[in-house]
Amino acid sequence: MLLKVLPVGLLSVNCSIVVDEESGEALVVDPGADPQRIIKELEPFELVGIIATHGHIDHVGQVKTLKEHFNAPFYMHPADKFLLSNPLWPGFERQIGANFPCPDPDVELKDGMEIRLGKSKLKVIHTPGHTPGLCCLYSEEDKTLIAGDLLFKGGVGRWDLPGGSREDLRRSLKRIFSELEDDVLVITGHYEETTIGQERLFNPYLRSLFV
């Protein structure tokens, strides 16, 4: 499995392009901005799905553009549908250049679901807290977690936006840190990648959440 991470937009959302090199099939995760750049990266491949880890506008801002260009299905957890027409703050959609509102998902993500990409597969892990429907995508073969805004290097997702829950976030983080090994690479929703082990040792927010 080939993974390319493109930081896009004003908020540096990590848009992940996942490719099965043998079949040439590709998935794109969290296409929040910079649609022409994303399209250029995807053109050599067959795009078979557009996935949002959650429904915040900075992560779904160009889903509509990619659906129209590639005619590929959109995957998201149904609990976040209410966010697809919510800019979070007045005028935020214009500030970040979103193609808004985002369409409803064609395929609903569910915990434990496997998304196949040629011979590769991504497991869906439902991890609410930042939003009710946030889902991580895990490649067991490559020991890589696409975490959306669940976890950051030195931080965790905020829980004070619509649908957020501190208690759900606590449970989701406990699940991730109990199920995954320390050498798992974490592609965060914004900024630098990290590992489960590094965050287990050094993330101050985890200590406060687990008290």
Question: How should each PLM-predicted stretch be described?
Answer:
Residues 1-45, 136-148:
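Conserved beta-strand hairpin/beta-sheet module of binuclear metal-dependent hydrolase folds
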Residues 6-8, 104-106, 126-128:
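Short Gly/Pro-enriched turn/cap motifs at secondary-structure boundaries
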Residues 18, 53, 127:
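Conserved S/T- and glycine-rich ATP-binding loop of Class I adenylate-forming
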Residues 22-23, 33, 57, 80, ...:
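Short, glycine/acidic-enriched loop or turn micro-motifs at the edges of active sites
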Residues 27, 51, 74, 146, ...:
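Residue-level marker for buried hydrophobic side chains located in beta-strands
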Residues 33-116, 120, 201-205, 209:
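Active-site HxH/HxHxD metal-binding segment of metal-dependent hydrolases
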Residues 92, 121-210:
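Metallo-beta-lactamase
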